[in-house]
Amino acid sequence: MPVRRGHVAPQNTFLDTIIRKFEGQSRKFIIANARVENCAVIYCNDGFCELCGYSRAEVMQRPCTCDFLHGPRTQRRAAAQIAQALLGAEERKVEIAFYRKDGSCFLCLVDVVPVKNEDGAVIMFILNFEVVMEKDMVGSPAHDTNHRGPSTSWLASGRAKTFRLKLPALLALTARESSVRTGSMHSAGAPGAVVVDVDLTPAAPSSESLALDEVSAMDNHVAGLGPAEERRALVGPGSASPVASIRGPHPSPRAQSLNPDASGSSCSLARTRSRESCASVRRASSADDIEAMRAGALPPPPRHASTGAMHPLRSGLLNSTSDSDLVRYRTISKIPQITLNFVDLKGDPFLASPTSDREIIAPKIKERTHNVTEKVTQVLSLGADVLPEYKLQAPRIHRWTILHYSPFKAVWDWLILLLVIYTAVFTPYSAAFLLKETEDGSQAPDCGYACQPLAVVDLIVDIMFIVDILINFRTTYVNANEEVVSHPGRIAVHYFKGWFLIDMVAAIPFDLLIFGSGSEELIGLLKTARLLRLVRVARKLDRYSEYGAAVLFLLMCTFALIAHWLACIWYAIGNMEQPHMDSHIGWLHNLGDQIGKPYNSSGLGGPSIKDKYVTALYFTFSSLTSVGFGNVSPNTNSEKIFSICVMLIGSLMYASIFGNVSAIIQRLYSGTARYHTQMLRVREFIRFHQIPNPLRQRLEEYFQHAWSYTNGIDMNAVLKGFPECLQADICLHLNRSLLQHCKPFRGATKGCLRALAMKFKTTHAPPGDTLVHAGDLLTALYFISRGSIEILRGDVVVAILGKNDIFGEPLNLYARPGKSNGDVRALTYCDLHKIHRDDLLEVLDMYPEFSDHFWSSLEITFNLRDTNMIPGSPGSAELESGFNRQRKRKLSFRRRTDKDTEQPGEVSALGQGPARVGPGPSCRGQPGGPWGESPSSGPSSPESSEDEGPGRSSSPLRLVPFSSPRPPGDPPGGEPLTEDGEKSDTCNPLSGAFSGVSNIFSFWGDSRGRQYQELPRCPAPAPSLLNIPLSSPGRRSRGDVESRLDALQRQLNRLETRLSADMATVLQLLQRQMTLVPPAYSAVTTPGPGPTSASPLLPVGPVPTLTLDSLSQVSQFVAFEELPAGAPELPQDGPTRRLSLPGQLGALTSQPLHRHGSDPGS
């Protein structure tokens, strides 16, 4: 297998670094994006959620000012200081009282820390929260109600209060900086202070504003950290007085928050547009000028230096007593006129503000970059080397550190490998054969290293091994998390725990340490310790075990090396016994006699070293292969015992290596063959399609990492070989972490969990890979199990998600999959579990008892559905009004509203009882709309989709005149009677044709005082022709729509003429039946002629009732009325478009609900 390179692709480790550092310190923090106009929260850790009591889904996309934690005891000054910190680029600490979700109050120290990108621009803010004390301990009420808590609905988080940062003309203030009055600069001081003049003239009654006199000129010391005496001595006693009163519809922010009907106001920093209610910011040259201004000695500035006539006011300034302090702690010098306005934000909170409004870095911020970095490091308790930047960056490699996969390290490893092989061969040989010869020739003249070339080589090997130890202390490694570790300290610890001891023993130069002692045999034995390096050689060569030829070669080399070692031992045994034997029966004496070189009586002479080594190697090879010829035989007991051991070793090696070579190769290369086959396919794919190099490198790196992660195992292929019950158990084990720790799956039965586990699929994504693109169809729900991702809209990061977060769309609220409103991109190597919407809904249909719990406990951290891209999709107002449905069949949902309890024959009167709000199955509008008073079905009705069956394709409504109170003798329920006196409990398929006609009776005359009731819908076998589908602008032109409307208008004109005549005939027939009980409808006057009627109508008597039969007859007439020849054919598929809705009608939630003037209940 290739060398493990680890995660070397550029990763965005911003979130991982912050979490790793903060979680160990039990921090509570949030991360906000400084480039969106509301500084929305894009990440919050579990500690913050536990602190405030809100879930992550409720906190995400909230303003980072945390105004949803404000309450009665929250200081406005502290809140303003936090807002000011978001304007600058320096950190600030503020003490403020916050409220939890349960209403309990606590005092918190908030650290606002900016985060910069590689260009030095502030792109994010980290807000760290530290609890100082509980308010209950200092005498506050037990529970103060948090009136600003957000709604528990996850959809409400996107429309809650937002924090808009607007900066007015900064260039104009920059140009005016040089025009400050020269009289105010007579003192030699630092022109860094900021003086705030505030006019106490109240603002306009329609706005609620809080002038930021304190906010625009404060630093960390004056933000509740400096002594009160110094601040009072510098500023004066009047600095704590309020500077502006809050006026508007509500007397105070608290009163406004107490009103449940009031829309959530947004806290925004906006420029004051009134010259009478804004604060001017001007510069002070020194502390003397500040004292003069505090005492009123400094005259007001000229008009060109401010925006209006301002009254000097003693305000909170820098907590300093000298000019040097002003130089050191000067604040932003060009802050424009700012007020804190509570306004309603109707726009998209995620859209970035213009460049002029988004730039919040002061002109001198570039000069303070190094100071900011030091302070950020102090606040975060992080080292400067690990302070992250929010960008894709390669792993940090320390200086003088060698990558373990670099070319230099590869060459060096091969060099060390050759030296180790040399050591393994020559160390036993020199210890057995050469030491005896050296002793025998010790009387020879001393010629140094020239006579001993192997001694020089041994010295070089020792030096190389020592250098290798030093290199290993600076070589990176891959940890258990597949991360490349380059820190010298961690590398040293890892090396000490691993191969350091073996390398150290193998590198000891024993011949130099024992030089001159004369014990050459001891030196030779100690040198055998170098053979310990063979363990590392085996580990290095294991990567080549995937090649068949290499394995055969390695096996042969191993066999030869073992034979070499045994030959050295065989010679050492014969050489040791030779001087002590009286009878010359050893194998050496026999060898000398055979080759004609016998030993003399003094033990000298005999065969040469070459003859001895070759003979010993011949004996060991023949013994290991069990092919002994007997020409070299053991004679002494020691030689026979050694021969037995050699035979045992040889039998094992021969049987395990040579006897099973094919089996070994097949077993070792099964995975390797699959790897190379798949890799070959990838390369052929790259070559065939001519993929460019950057993309080719991504493909290869992803394949290699995925192969090392899964080892080339195809889970689907493996699972298909097992029965379904075993497949479910395996999938349950693989997804056990998700099913155990994810809240929506708690409480599910084991059978339900097994069914869900079968539907989950695991996705692995490298850094920089885009999982979902903007506009893609959302067909699955994603659960993050490892890594972190970011969600972008354009180039703006709107959310950062990590482990255990969920993103997608709420499947129970939409019948059809929506489209993504942003890009989802991986920051690190991520593992995600995804389940398709069809599979999830199918499982929940099988377990309806678990479905309620699942939908109620599912909290999607970020909703990717883009409602603006889908015409007629329900908005947040509809969803908050009860637009909650459950899946009853596949892709069919049942609306749970108050109307479900009514019987099919009951009549619900508009204006009596609770009106249905939102896109219900039988009502899509409300009376009093801008185009009529009749309820109508909008195009966003989920029941009108094609995949819900023909019975749900349309929702016809029946319109009947609103009746007066029913007489006591009338039948209950108010159903109209047929001619036979029976109740009509069935609906004509065309009886709802008038549901889409806006105020059709207005053609007869004045319809004032008449209301229409909504009858329960009945399934129609075929859709009405008047239910015109909403045509797509891309498929039908505007002229087709206009011609269709003209045809319908002509139909209505003919309908008026015939309806007047038919009504007279019908009413005369009804008046003859005196035995019938009068129905429950009030009398209707005879309608006059229509505005376009060609002939006058015959006068008739008063209309006593209007039955369903009459309306049914009229509906049938309309259904079978032919269209003119020039009118286009009406399509029958797609969502229906009611005639009461104009062509440019927007979403229903955007239209305010009005009650008609003739409504009796208004």
Swiss-Prot record:
Topology Cytoplasmic: residue spans: 1-405, 474-497, 544-549, 662-1162
Modification(s) after translation: Phosphorylated on serine and threonine residues. Phosphorylation by PKA inhibits ion conduction.
Biased composition (Polar residues): 254-271
Region feature cNMP-binding domain, mapped onto this chain: 744-844
A molecular function (GO) term: voltage-gated potassium channel activity
Pro residues bias: start-end ranges: 964-974
Reaction catalysed by this enzyme: K(+)(in) = K(+)(out)
Segments forming domain PAC: 92-144
Residues spanning the membrane: 406-426, 453-473, 498-518, 523-543, 550-570, 641-661
Alphabetical list of InterPro entries matching this protein: cNMP-bd_dom, cNMP-bd_dom_sf, Ion_trans_dom, K_chnl_volt-dep_EAG/ELK/ERG, K_chnl_volt-dep_ERG, KCNH_animal-type, PAC, PAS
Record's bilayer topology term: Multi-pass membrane protein
Modified sites of kind Phosphoserine: 239, 241, 245, 285-286, 322, 353, 873, 876, 1140
Protein name (database record): Voltage-gated inwardly rectifying potassium channel KCNH2
Record carries keyword DNA repair: no
Xref: SUPFAM superfamilies: cAMP-binding domain-like, PYP-like sensor domain (PAS domain), Voltage-gated potassium channels
This protein's encoding gene: Kcnh2
The species this protein was found in: Mus musculus
Domain notes per entry: The S4-S5 linker acts as a signal integrator where it both couples voltage-sensor domain (VSD) movement to pore opening and closure, as well as providing a binding site for other domains that regulate activation and/or deactivation of the channel.
Entry similarity comment: Belongs to the potassium channel family. H (Eag) (TC 1.A.1.20) subfamily. Kv11.1/KCNH2 sub-subfamily.
Biased composition (Low complexity): 932-943
A Pfam family per the record: cNMP_binding
